[in-house]
């Protein structure tokens, strides 16, 4: 039933047979290419779904059939990925293992076609003249344990990262990604995320090199927004820190920015950014990769002006490793490098807008069960209290039958021996 493992350490994700739900036709891994496969997906697209046969219980786990341009492919079906075999390519931890648990159905819901519908804190359509903007609390001021009816801009970036599976690393990952690769992956997911009556891709600006296809697409999105009056969203890496240009931060400078308006930021937004993302800004100044998501309103264009300018309405930052895995600290970065070096498969659970939830720094995906790993690098009373809560949580052997792993910097300066993957103990 399963396709052969192809990695150097035997921990690769597997391909399993796929059944087309409405016809019952089964395609083993060896037949999941070619004309018959593509024809079957095209006929099934929008009318049914696939079933992954990764478990020997005769109950296929649903998978989505999606279209990208002229191509069709099979992808995870939302809220069911945790029911797959741990080594299945469609497996992912459940919403309860990330910050997605912190939203109501008003904030995020699954459409009948498998797409997502979300409601943002700040709408893409500007309020009518005289109508007030909603007052948004900074990320650290959110009420604890309160499920939210809207998604913040940072939550949207976490959602896109998760849906594109950029927060997951497999031991057979073929190569490092570029900013343009990441932009393409985000665009693919934006096409299936609905905000009001439109999909996100219609207002999304992404990293682009001059004169390339992405540059032209960005320009078209900006031109369309000038006609419609919609607000835009840009995602991209912060440009390398320049102490002369960036110390006062009058503008948000993105890397690979072609087609993106010049982003001017006012004092109030700048103060909020520095308060909420001090660690990320510090890492940026140290040369680390930091991605930004920016919601903007285009400024009127003066006659004879060729440069588009926009006012930054909101901005959130995300710290990343060289492999674009999200990180919350420099110690997580050290651990992430070690996991990659050791040939492990893992995922980084995204917090979204649910900062008080208990979930680990990473989940190991090669243990055949939920296996949390943590790095503890602080010693404040508040941090120690949270660490105690996590220790109690992970002691539950029903949830975590193989236990958990941690690296406490105050106990061990070097990373302790990692647990062996399931394949080595078999």
Q: What are these model-derived regions, one by one?
A:
Residues 112-317:
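Charged linear interaction tracts used for macromolecular binding and regulation
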Residues 73, 233, 359:
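Broad gene-expression machinery/nucleic-acid interaction feature
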Residues 103-107, 131-140, 318-327:
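Intrinsic-disorder/low-complexity linker and hinge segments
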Residues 53, 234-236, 348, 406:
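A structural signal for short, well-ordered beta-strand segments and their strand-loop junctions
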């Amino acid at each position: 039933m399963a396709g052969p493992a192809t990695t150097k350490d035997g921990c690769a994700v597997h391909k399993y047979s796929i059944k087309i739900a409405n016809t019952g036709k089964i395609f083993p891994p060896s037949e999941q290419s070619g004309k018959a496969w593509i024809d079957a997906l095209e006929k099934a697209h929008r009318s049914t779904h696939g079933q992954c046969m990764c478990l020997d219980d005769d109950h296929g786990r649903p998978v989505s059939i999606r279209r990208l341009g002229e191509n069709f492919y099979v992808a995870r079906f939302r809220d069911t990925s945790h029911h797959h075999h741990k080594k299945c390519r469609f497996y992912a931890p459940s919403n309860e293992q990330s910050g997605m648990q912190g939203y109501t159905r008003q904030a995020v819901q699954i459409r009948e076609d498998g797409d997502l519908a979300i409601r943002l804190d700040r709408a893409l359509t500007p309020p009518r003249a005289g109508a007030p903007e909603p007052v948004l609390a900074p990320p650290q001021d959110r009420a604890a344990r309160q499920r939210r009816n809207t998604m913040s801009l940072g939550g949207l970036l976490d959602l896109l990262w998760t849906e594109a599976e950029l927060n997951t690393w497999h031991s057979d990952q073929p190569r490092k990604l570029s900013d343009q690769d990441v932009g393409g992956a985000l665009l693919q997911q934006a096409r299936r995320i609905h905000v009001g009556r439109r999909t996100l891709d219609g207002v999304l600006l992404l990293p682009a090199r001059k004169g390339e296809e992405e540059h032209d697409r960005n320009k078209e999105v900006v031109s369309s927004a000038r006609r419609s009056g919609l607000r835009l969203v840009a995602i991209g890496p912060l440009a390398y820190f320049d102490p002369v240009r960036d110390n006062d931060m009058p503008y948000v400078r993105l890397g690979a920015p072609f087609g993106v308006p010049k982003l001017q930021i006012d004092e109030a937004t700048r103060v909020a950014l520095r308060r909420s993302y001090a660690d990320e800004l510090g890492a940026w100044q140290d040369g680390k990769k930091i991605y930004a998501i920016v919601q903007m309103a285009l400024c009127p264009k003066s006659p004879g002006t060729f440069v588009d300018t926009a006012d930054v309405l909101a901005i959130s930052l995300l710290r990343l490793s060289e492999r674009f895995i999200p990180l919350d600290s420099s110690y997580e970065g050290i651990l992430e490098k070690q996991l990659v070096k050791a040939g492990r498969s893992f995922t980084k659970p995204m917090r979204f807008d649910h900062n008080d939830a208990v979930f680990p720094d990473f989940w190991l995906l090669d243990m055949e069960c939920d296996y949390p790993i943590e790095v503890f690098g602080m010693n404040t009373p508040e941090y120690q209290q949270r660490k105690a809560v996590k220790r109690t949580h992970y002691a539950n052997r029903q949830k975590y039958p193989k236990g958990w792993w941690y690296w406490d910097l105050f106990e061990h300066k070097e990373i302790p021996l990692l647990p062996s993957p399931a394949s080595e103990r078999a």
